[in-house]
Every structure is written in structure tokens, then in C-alpha cells.
Amino acid sequence: MTTSKSQNYLLKLATGSGVCMSAFLLTPEPVDANICSLDNPLSINVMGCYKTPDRYVVKILEMGLCTSNPLSGTNFEGSTCTPTYTNADGVEIDVAAGAATLTGGTSTRPASDIYPHAYVKMANTFGLKGSYQLNSNTYCSKSDGTADATPGCTAQNFTETLRSFSGRCSNPYNTDDAKASEVLTEGTMSARLTNSSYVTATDCDATHLVGALALTNSVVIDDSTAGLEVQFTVSNSGMTIIPTNNNGNVVGQFAGGPFQAVFSLY
């Protein structure tokens, strides 16, 4: 197992082959996963639609591979996991901006083995920015995530914090509010909202997010494997455009959408 300071751990954002992990993001309303289309204003529908954001900043603290599911129990259990990248303070990267570099952390080559699971640990805050043209009107994100329809507007940065997968903080906070899962082509994705010790949240006060993927096809590390590359993409998915009415013809709010992280061997 080889460990080194990761000063040039490249995150390629182009589409590529590898292990795909979809992360979950909170939107203020349930969203039908339509892709926004300028050619079809009805694509926004009453529930909203997805588009590529101008800015999508995430803070990564750890990524790695596991020989068993780290989220099979109530909390994250990493005893069978090998971190491929760690940074105790976290490193912020703008996934929407193109190639980014994970700096200040430690990169580790996993031992030769078969890994049926992959995971990522991150902060539960997301830095976003975007705009959308609908019915000849351009809407821009404001600093609180609401839409600015002023002619000639400029999109502003805003921050979204994920505290519940249900889109609301129940009273009392339900255990289902802190977890989510989805069956993907690449495997079954699970996610948990946690505290800084990666204990699953029991109240609306989460500070971190963990995602784990039970892979359809395991990652096989052998002696010829030099390491892992990670690719992120938010194309047609990283931002949610939310209308103000049932007709879906006026934009009221911008929110986060899902992104994907892809682990590739080299």
C-alpha cells in the first residue's frame, strides 16, 4: 500500500468509464428528473427540472473502496475500507468549472484486492450558481437561491445545506429523513446525513454526508494498478429549476441537483 501527499490528484470532469457514484442533494420540493430544455419550456413541468449549473462547489473529506458495505448498519462503519484520498479539513472543488485538483490531503493506493463497495465523505453544504431562460425571460440565482427576473440580471452565488432527504425537517426527526437509497445501473447507492463523527443524524443538525455504492461490478486492484482517478459531472443534473406555480411558466427558485463521482483505474 503506497501513501503520499496528494498535490496533484486530478479530478477529470469529462465522461469516462469507471465506478459511478451518484450523490443525493436536497431540493425544497420533490423533483421529477426532467432535463430542462430551452426548446421545450414545458420541460420544467410543475415539479421543476434539472440543468447544468454555472457553479457547483463541494467539500470532499474522504473517498475510498471497501470489501463490505460501510452503510449496512445504522452508522458508517469503515473497518473494511481503504481511503484513497483523505483531507481532515476537506478540500473545496468546483465541479462545474472543469478539471480541479485535490490539494493538501493524502492519496493512498489500495492493497491488491476485490472491492465490491466504494464511498465518499463530504460536507453537507453546496455552493451553487446558475441562470435559466424561460419564455424569453432570463432568471438568475440570487444569494438566497430565489430567482431574479430583472432584465440583464447576473447570477449570484448561494449556499444550500442538506439536512433532510425528505425535503423538510420533521418534528420529531424521522430516521428516514437522514437516509436515502437508489438503484442505479452501476449498483445500489446509499446515503446518510451524519455528524462530524459520521454517526447518522437523529435531528435536523447534520454537518456531513456519506455516500456508499454496492457495485454491480467490483473494482479489482492488482499489482499492475498504479492508482485511481476520480471524475465528477453535473451535466444536465447539478441544478434544479423550481417554478412558482402549477403551470411551470415562472421560475421561483434555484436549488441543488445530483452529481456523479466516477472512480477509474489507471
Task: Please provide the spans of the model-predicted regions.
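A short, solvent-exposed, low-complexity linear motif enriched for acidic/polar residues
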Residues: D32-Y266
